[in-house]
Amino acid sequence: MRGGYMELNLASTCDVLVLGSGIAGISAALTAAESGASVILVCKGRLFSGSSFYPGTWGLGLVGPADEADEADLISTIEDVGCGMADDALVRALVKGIHPAIEKVRSMGVRLRKAGKGGQQEYIPCFDHKHRDWNGIEFDSAREIFSQRLEELGVTILSGRETLELVRADGRVCGAVITDGAELHYLGCKALVLATGGYGSLFRHHLCTSDVEGLGQALALEAGCRLVQLFRTA
């Protein structure tokens, strides 16, 4: 620090820089690393945080179509609940991609729960109108398996770092400025993935953890992105 100002240091460069360490961020980091890319994953708190690893429960429930014939109904239900705000292409990608994604997680060795005890098979998902296929990712197992895989693939983990700004050059994002509270660092990248979650904790009454504060949306907006589908879910 000089004259009351922090110096900006070049920390590192990589092919893919991932901001956020929930399920989306972890999945992006693993997929990029498996393709041969060098990956840095940055998270404000600890690894495995946010709503994906909500501390008030044992795991994360995953809802999908009961079978192929149920896909159209689930797509329609999501779009109806979304009151016209849902992107049809993204809805279809979710519905058609959820089972392959679940199988990939299972093949990695992560323990998944199935509905079947105490009337669980009779439960209807929130905002839905019928029974669907349900699987639950057990957090303890996910942390163990994902940590091992991230290490095997050589993903660099920078936890306890706050992202302050996305850096642009020639009309594209080329890196980010982060801080550990004592120093400023620039991380350069060829591609950047924002997986920082939602913004539910900005509201006085919310169910999510305090780190779900809209950081990614603010960074993206400042970098010139257009925000869509901004409605609170937690």
Region annotations inferred by a language model:
Residues A11-C14, A182-A191:
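Core beta-strand elements of the Rossmann-like FAD/NAD(P) dinucleotide-binding domain
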Residues V16-L41:
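N-terminal Rossmann-like FAD-binding beta1-loop-alpha1 element of flavoenzymes
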Residues R2-Y5, T31, K44-R172, I178, ...:
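Conserved N-terminal/central alpha/beta ligand/cofactor-binding core
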Residues M1-V16, E34:
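Extreme N-terminal leader/targeting segments of oxidoreductases
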Residues E34-A37, G59-V63, C208-G214:
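A glycine- and small-aliphatic-rich helix-loop capping segment at beta-alpha/alpha-beta transitions
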Residues A191-A234:
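Glycine-rich loop(s) and the adjacent beta-strand/alpha-helix scaffold that form part
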Residues G25, I157, L184-H185:
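Ligand-binding pocket scaffold of soluble enzyme catalytic domains
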